[in-house]
Amino acid sequence: SFPTRRSSDLMNTAAVVGFGYVVKSTVGFQNLIDMLSNLGGNPLISFASATTLIAGATGSGSGGIGIAMEVFAQKYMDLGVNPAVLHRIAAIACNGLDTLPHNSMVITCLAACGMTHKESYKPIFITSVCITLIGLAFAVFLGIAFN
């Protein structure tokens, strides 16, 4: 028989993936995409910001990178951004805000460990959001300096 814990984890993941698809289909999400499409400033900074915000909104790094590359990649390549640099920035940026409390990995790990968000989210936030965003800032700096 299928263990209860595993079916619960599977349901958590399915629910959060479904959440990402629902978010993507809303007017508010389209407004976010429109706003992010008009970010000015350095292309790498605006692309990194857009990618990580999309990942945060969908609660998914893979969803964030997929949407960002589909919507923004050609625009930034047309501005002269090296495609390899763009990809590296996207790969880091999609992990910046993807582990907010509604992320399926966070929910599943906490459920598997029998912990609550209140008990355990702070160290998750520090290691997976704060440190990743610091790394993203460094990668953007290097991309600007050497692009």
Question: What does each model-identified segment do?
Answer:
Residues 13-16, 39-79, 91:
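Hydrophobic alpha-helical transmembrane segments of multi-pass integral membrane proteins
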Residues 31, 62-75, 104-115:
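Re-entrant/interfacial helical elements at transmembrane boundaries that shape
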Residues 22-38, 146-147:
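Membrane-interface helix termini and inter-helical loops of multi-pass transporters
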Residues 12, 16-19, 29, 69, ...:
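Alpha-helical transmembrane segments of polytopic integral membrane proteins
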Residues 31-42, 85, 91-101:
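Structural signature of hydrophobic alpha-helical transmembrane segments
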Residues 94-147:
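Juxtamembrane and boundary regions of transmembrane helices in multi-pass small-molecule transporters
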Residues 13-20, 47-55, 128-142:
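Hydrophobic core segments of alpha-helical transmembrane domains in multi-pass membrane transport
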Residues 1-7:
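Short, small-residue-biased leader/transition segments that mark boundaries at the very start
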